[in-house]
Amino acid sequence: MRAALLAGGWAYAAAIVFLSLTPNPPHPGFEHGDKLGHLLAYGLLMFWFCYLYRYRYTQLAYGIGWIALGIALEFAQGATGTRSFEVADMAADSLGVLLGWGISATLRK
């Protein structure tokens, strides 16, 4: 079961990478909806891996990694010519990671 959950988590991370670099990603029908999408995507990603890894230092390492991924993907988007670099997206990704971690810690108590 754990192996399946781990594979699902990595598949979800791969989907985030794909959607971040695809030329025409799906767009929500409201202003700043993409920021909400970033927040929810990275929040769920962090929550998922916090569920799988209970040790705080392992969670911290994943959190740093997911934030770094979000930052790297924004720079990659800026280099594509079809997507744009946005600091607000990096902030939404980072906030999502922190919220996912915080919710996970709260539910664990």
Stretches with model-predicted labels:
Residues 21-28, 54, 78, 82-86, ...:
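Transmembrane helix-loop junctions in multipass membrane proteins, especially transporters and channels
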Residues 23, 40, 73, 84, ...:
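Short, flexible micro-motifs
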Residues 15-20, 46-50, 66-74, 97, ...:
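Alpha-helical transmembrane segments of multi-pass membrane proteins
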Residues 1-4, 55-63, 87:
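Membrane-helix interface segments
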Residues 1-50:
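"…centered on the first transmembrane helix and the immediately adjacent amphipathic helix/loop
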Residues 10, 17, 39, 44, ...:
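Residue-level signature of the transmembrane alpha-helical core
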Residues 29-35, 73-95:
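Interfacial helix-loop-helix junctions of multi-pass membrane proteins
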Residues 40-55, 59, 97-108:
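Membrane-interfacial alpha-helical segments at the cytosolic side of multi-pass membrane proteins
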